[in-house]
């Protein structure tokens, strides 16, 4: 009789087993995310502020160059009352069109870099690893993230041409694709497939999580720019918590206050 060998080990990262019941609760996701945010507030807020400044710089520079390179024609008008006015017509030149195209590419790349960087930091927080501000500027698997993002945008655009709804549906079910690429180093196609399977395993939880993330961002918008510095990190943490729980992963639970040190007091004698 042959001796039984050791049991097979778990699949390597990027090849999750069949998704089982996650026990996901959107209330737990919000509570965990807020707890983690309060413990890492400065570390989370500073990168979001820096990325916002970078995005504004790219948008402003692109708009300024497009206007500067475009042809402008000024027409003066005088009405019957003798009041003069002017109108300026701006015609985009080929050079301005090229600058606008390059600006869109730069903006898209920066958004994906920001998304991957914030996810990298939030995933480290979920693993209980120490994070610094620099962690959020060192995204993992950036090449996979860029290709995955291009794939999602392309399919969503094609779906949008088909009465809009197919594109919206694909965008929703592919919401965890970038997280898979960052966390498990899966290929772009495998990342999208894994996201579709993850969302399909718990559509209700995915919808509630998405609504919670949207609410966090909208509340941040209502509180002006300062609120967005809180809303975006909280939404990212909710996203990571949901991704981990629904895909069969784990997160380090929120730290609870330690019990008082020492023996409890005994009964008092009269």
Q: For each of these PLM feature ranges, what is it?
A:
Residues 1-22, 252-270:
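Intrinsically disordered, low-complexity Pro/Gly-rich regions
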